[in-house]
């Protein structure tokens, strides 16, 4: 322990034929992504990530996860804004299954740089309020979870269940 590290060396000595076409630039009219706006939204929801005074208890909207309870019901094809507020003293990476998001704003400020792209997880720091927008595509019906992506927080209850109706 504490003495040196092992490093693996890779020697690549063969080239393999590859018929994959990679563009130097995208063809005219190709759209990588488009920004969703508040005008696209058909519904808004609020989520508060917090912790309890009881040791090791993490909550979303004042509740611990229960597989027997659907916390949110979403219409298939809906575009929704989810507002996530972190009232705890530690950061929480908010993650939802089966949907990609765009950050609308963080504490009221528009996203810049890498925050402008599609996300499946968004970091919400202590005291922050982050609004995200996503479209629940037609293939995404069924029950899914949203949760803090820190395993110990998720296991301690910081998770909810949402259902996308067919």
Language-model features and meaning:
Residues 1-91, 137-143, 147-166:
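Extended terminal and domain-junction accessory segments
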Residues 93-95:
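Beta-strand signatures of extracellular beta-sandwich domains
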């Amino acid at each position: 322990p504490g003495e040196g590290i092992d490093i693996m060396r890779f020697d690549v000595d063969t080239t393999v034929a590859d018929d994959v076409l990679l563009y130097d630039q995208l063809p005219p009219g190709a759209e990588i992504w488009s920004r969703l706006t508040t005008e696209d939204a058909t519904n808004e929801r609020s989520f508060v990530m917090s912790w309890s005074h009881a040791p090791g208890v993490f909550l979303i909207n004042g509740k611990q996860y229960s597989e027997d309870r659907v916390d949110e019901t979403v219409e298939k094809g809906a575009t929704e804004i989810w507002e996530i507020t972190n009232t705890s003293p530690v950061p929480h990476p908010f993650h939802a299954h089966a949907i990609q998001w765009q950050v609308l704003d963080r504490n009221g400020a528009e996203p810049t740089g890498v925050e402008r792209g599609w996300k499946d997880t968004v970091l919400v720091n202590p005291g922050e309020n982050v609004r995200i927008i996503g479209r629940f595509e037609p293939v995404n019906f069924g029950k899914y979870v949203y949760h803090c992506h820190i395993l110990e927080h998720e296991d301690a209850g910081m998770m909810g269940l949402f259902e996308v109706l067919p």
